Curated annotation (Swiss-Prot):
GO terms for cellular component: plasma membrane. One of its GO terms (biological process) is aerobic respiration. It comes from the Bacteria. It comes from Salinibacter ruber (strain DSM 13855 / M31). It catalyses: a quinone + NADH + 5 H(+)(in) = a quinol + NAD(+) + 4 H(+)(out). This is NADH-quinone oxidoreductase subunit H.
Length: 345
């Protein structure tokens, strides 16, 4: 019998490689969708339909010279991109891809997610500080302030889901969303305010437009990674796209039924052999990926639809609007759990 640690290691290996491939596909998808929105062709020269363009970009990063700023802290400067990638890949281990298919099935999975989201601030801050550049430092400080500000609202949105599901385990949160019927059991229907807040804060946490203040080209050149080149810059690039993909996964997992197939109970009633089968697991995985692909498209769509916030507007939205609304929403759901006997902690 194969030990459980071997299965965990194999699962982690597969997830890491899947995230690497997904990041490449996201780069290609963003370029093509952006080109479509801007009415231009997009990459179409490297390989059929430009499909090999992301791999050409990786080769470019590998072959580029790695320039180290003269007065920088060399060790921290080199470790910052590694920290970002490791945290992004670790977060991917919490995603339930189908019923029973998850690398780390933790009873405190939600707390683990919030913890990993919090410590990702360190990679950005250390990159800005260690570069010995005012642009990098300001970009790092902006990013830290932004991420800390929006983590509070994100945490409250997640707490509202935990109160409804009565569990901190992602698998149980997904399964709880099957209790209300085809789509009515989704937390997006039961908790629309929490869903909207989580989506907005996910944009801010991943530094995606219109919340990409740490990389405001007009003010800070490239922000916290201004002084990075070669594969170190490529690692920041990779971490950003992996975080974007993972954010889409957790939006779907927490609010849109995760891997649950619409009308899944009816399908199992018609075909009882489906229950617990490999075919059902494949259907669940396809359902999850379709939902995730939609939200990945939404990230691109929003980037080319809304202008970037000013820094004071960014802070105002986070502290003056999102945080009070998220807190009020969590309190109302907690009262509902107590007064109406809903499933709670």
């Amino acid at each position: 019998m194969i030990p459980s640690m071997v299965w965990t290691a194999l699962g982690a290996f597969l997830v890491i490689n899947a995230m690497l491939l997904s990041a490449s596909l996201l780069v290609f998808a963003e370029r093509r969708v952006s080109a479509f929105i801007q009415n231009r062709p997009g990459p179409n020269r490297v390989g059929p339909l430009g499909l090999l363009q992301p791999f050409a970009d990786v080769l470019k990063f590998v072959l580029k010279e790695d320039v180290q700023p003269a007065q920088s802290n060399k060790f921290i400067h080199s470790m910052a991109p590694v920290v970002m990638v490791v945290i992004a890949m670790t977060t991917a281990s919490l995603i339930p891809f189908a019923e029973g298919v998850v690398v780390a099935d933790l009873n405190v999975g939600v707390i683990m997610l919030l913890a990993l989201t919090s410590i990702s601030v360190y990679g950005v801050t250390l990159a800005g500080w260690s570069s010995n550049s005012k642009f990098s430092l300001l970009g790092g400080l902006r990013s830290a302030a932004q991420m800390v500000s929006y983590e509070l609202s994100m945490g409250l949105a997640v707490i509202s889901v935990v109160l409804i599901a009565g569990s901190l385990n992602f698998m149980e949160i997904v399964e709880h969303q099957s209790s209300g019927g085809a789509l009515l059991g989704w937390n997006a229907v039961r908790n629309p305010i929490g869903c909207l807040i989580f989506i907005v804060t996910a944009f801010a946490e991943t530094n995606r437009a219109p919340f990409d203040l740490p990389e405001a080209e007009e003010e800070l050149v490239a922000g916290y990674h201004t002084e990075y080149s070669g594969m170190k810059f490529g690692m920041f690039f990779l971490a950003e796209y992996v975080n974007w993909f993972i954010a889409s996964f957790f939006i779907v997992t927490l609010f849109f039924g995760g891997y649950l197939v619409p009308l899944e109970p009816q399908l199992i009633a018609l075909f009882p052999a489906l229950e617990g089968s490999t075919l059902l697991a494949l259907l669940q995985f396809v359902s999850l990926m379709l939902k995730v692909s939609f939200f990945s498209f939404v990230f691109i769509w929003v980037r080319w639809t809304f202008p970037r916030f000013k820094y004071n507007q960014l802070m105002k939205v986070g502290w003056k609007y999102l945080l009070p609304i998220a807190l009020a929403n969590a309190i109302l759901i907690a009262l509902g759990v107590v007064l109406f006997g809903a499933v709670g902690l």
